[in-house]
Amino acid sequence: MFGLINIGFGNVIAGDRVIAIVNPESAPLKRLKEDAKEEGKLIDATYGRKTRSILITDSNHIILSAIQPETIAQRFIESMVEIEKQLEKIRKG
């Protein structure tokens, strides 16, 4: 269970929809990016900067971000911890 995750430059994504955060340097991922562009499923959130991570969603959309994969992963962890804290408060009533 995740909330909205900041992927840079004021862009946020629904964390529950992301299935992978990967480094974009390999040839297969470059092909995946090109295929998504042809299919109209590429979302470029880099604001013209270098793509540092590719996020793959459960709807097969490919999201490009200028933020490092490790940074985005840390934001997922922080979001999960915050949601767990809120759920614990609710459980205690």
From Swiss-Prot:
Coiled coil: none
InterPro entries referenced in this protein's UniProt entry, alphabetically: RemA-like (IPR007169)
Top-level division of the source organism's lineage: Bacteria
TM helices/strands, residue ranges: none
A matching Pfam family: RemA-like
Family label: Belongs to the RemA family.
Protein name in the entry: Putative regulatory protein Fnod_1678
Organism, as annotated: Fervidobacterium nodosum (strain ATCC 35602 / DSM 5306 / Rt17-B1)
